[in-house]
Structure formats: C-alpha cells, structure tokens
A protein has these predicted regions:
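Short beta-strand segments
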Residues: 60-64, 134-136
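Acidic, divalent-metal-coordinating active-site segment for phosphoryl/phosphodiester hydrolysis
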Residues: 66-69
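Helical "lid/coupling" subdomains associated with nucleotide-phosphate turnover
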Residues: 3-55, 72-74, 80-238
Length: 238
C-alpha cells in the first residue's frame, strides 16, 4: 500500500496493528522525514560515485506515491529542498476520478500537474540546473528497459521517454505488469510518475535524465550501506 494512503487513512493505526499481528513483525509507516533522509542518502551516494555529476548543479527528483521531493545539489552539497503534493498515485487517482479515457489520459495528467510544475519552476528560477536525477518506483523500471548495460545509473533521453509515455497511456494493465515486472495495481501510477519527471526536466530545458537502474525500494535500501558519513552531513546541511 502506498505510504501516503496509509498516512492519510482514518484507520491507519488499526491496519498497522493487524499487519503486526498477522506477520509478527513490528510495522510503522514511513513519514516524510524518513523518506527525505532516504532519498538524500541515496542521491549523496550517487554523486560521490559520479565525479562529473558531483561537480554540477544537480536537481534530484523523487516522485513518491503522494508527494514529489526535489533537492538541489551544488558540488555535492544540498542547498535547497522542496516538497509538493504531486505523487504518482495521488495524480493517477485524481485523473482517474475525472473519467479520462486512454485517448486523453496523457494530456489530462499534464494538465493536472501543470500548476504544481509552474510552482517548481518558480522555486528554482534563480538556480540554473545542469542535470536531473530522477528517482521513483515508476520512472526507474520504465527507464531501465532502455538501459544498454548494467551500469547503476543510466542517462535516459527525454524524447525517447516521451515516446514510451505515449505507449504507457494506451497499454493494458496486464501488458504493463509483464513488461515492467510489477503487480497490476502498481501499473496505475506508472504513467503519472513518468510524466511528472518528464515535465520537470522539460521545463528546465534538459534533454536527458539520469535514472538509477533497478527497483527503487531496493536501491534506496542498499544505498544506506556505508552511509554514516552522509547521514551526519544530512543533519548538518539540512
């Protein structure tokens, strides 16, 4: 279940209690602070491993289920952070309630997020962006299908991703589940997540996005390994 749905549910505590009883494992919902720290540690590790990116002004975008987080890094250090209610599931749910058909789905998603995209552009208007790193459960499996090797970070052409987005908008759920190796429920936000990233990158005039390959959750957790130094720097900088 997407964390934003759990955090906003009236019976969240009851659901967590039942999950704990059924599994025998203590469970809690990740809050915004938890996710922000995870994303920061992950991006900090990417920049450390990519010297060229580490010298640039990099905007990291994490399109989560309910919110989109943006972090601006200059020479490897975070200098600005913003969060917006523009998550992949949130957008997909809102557009679904509009009754969009496949013919209008892509344009309806763009229209729905346009206002928030303009807010993002305004927030970073005084900061020239050299590169974008896009992180998320939707953009990563989609972009990974374009990867030519097993590098942990790929550079995805925006025009190519835009063509994939058009395919996503007309594809059946079963086909999407098989292609991107996700369950059927997780296919619903795929298009919204990809579009959010493309719209942000496009507004800043970037022709490509750097995308970590593989599954987002696994990469976030493995990114914690050896991250003690980054964690201390996170506290200091943020």
């Amino acid at each position: 279940m997407p964390s934003y749905l759990l955090s906003e549910a009236d019976n969240a505590e009851l659901l967590l209690d039942r999950l704990q009883v059924a599994s025998g494992v203590e469970a809690r919902s990740l809050d915004d602070g938890d996710m922000t720290r995870l994303v920061y540690l992950f991006v900090a590790r990417i920049l450390k491993e990519q010297p060229a990116l580490n010298k640039s002004r990099v905007l990291a975008i994490h399109v989560g289920p309910g919110n989109t987080r943006l972090m601006l890094f200059k020479k490897g250090r975070i200098v600005q952070y913003n969060s917006y209610r523009m998550g992949a599931y949130r957008v997909a749910d809102a557009v679904e309630k509009m009754g969009s058909g496949s013919d209008n789905l892509l344009s309806d998603i763009k229209a729905h997020v346009n206002g928030i995209i303009e807010q993002i552009v305004g927030a970073y208007a005084n900061e020239p962006i050299d590169e974008v790193i896009a992180i998320g459960h939707e953009i990563q499996p989609v972009a990974t299908t374009l990867a030519k090797d097993e590098e942990p970070l790929m550079k995805a052409d925006r025009k190519t991703l835009s063509r994939l987005a058009k395919q996503l908008s007309v594809s059946k759920e079963k086909q999407l589940a098989e292609t991107y190796e996700v369950n059927v429920y997780a296919t619903r936000p795929l298009l919204a997540g990809v579009v959010c990233n493309l719209e942000v990158a496009g507004k800043f005039g970037l022709s490509a996005l750097h995308v970590p390959t593989g599954r987002c959750g696994e990469r976030l957790l493995t990114g914690l390994a050896g991250s003690d130094f980054a964690a201390k720097r996170f506290v200091h900088e943020v």
